[in-house]
Amino acid sequence: MTGWQGERQKVEWGEIERRLETRLPADFKEICEVFGRGAFCGYLELLPVDSAGPRSLLGRWTAMKERWANPRMRARFEPYQVFEQSGLILWGQSVTEASYYWLADASASPETWPIVARTDPLEELHRFDVSTSEFICRVLTDRDFRPFSVASKVKSLYFEPYG
């Protein structure tokens, strides 16, 4: 789809999944290994999975858990909660502050987890019963996938690696 031919990344999924206490969707893992750090069409970024730094998938999940006691924080995500056996796990974002989560459930197959997303931290959350890869594809290519589509702004599909 993007013509990307970079070197495949090695990711320690066992450690990430051990800390989360759940497996992650196979298509997300495949995308991370094939593309590594970067952005699709200069817009949609997957959170880094090669570290536990504050901007990584694990770092953002940890920070969200730590702030969850704040009632204003919880109100911004109602009716959902941060993942602890079930709940939201942030996996991606856009350069315009859109946020992409799984509505994860450790007792269910990760391939069945819906996507919950919003275009802005103060906007409403939208639920999509699609895989991670389908969600990414629709954001980039489906002009009718509102309010998340950037298809009308993207002339060709590409992946821009970071660092």
State each model region's role.
Residues 83-84, 108-110:
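A generic structural signal for short, non-catalytic loop/turn and secondary-structure boundary residues
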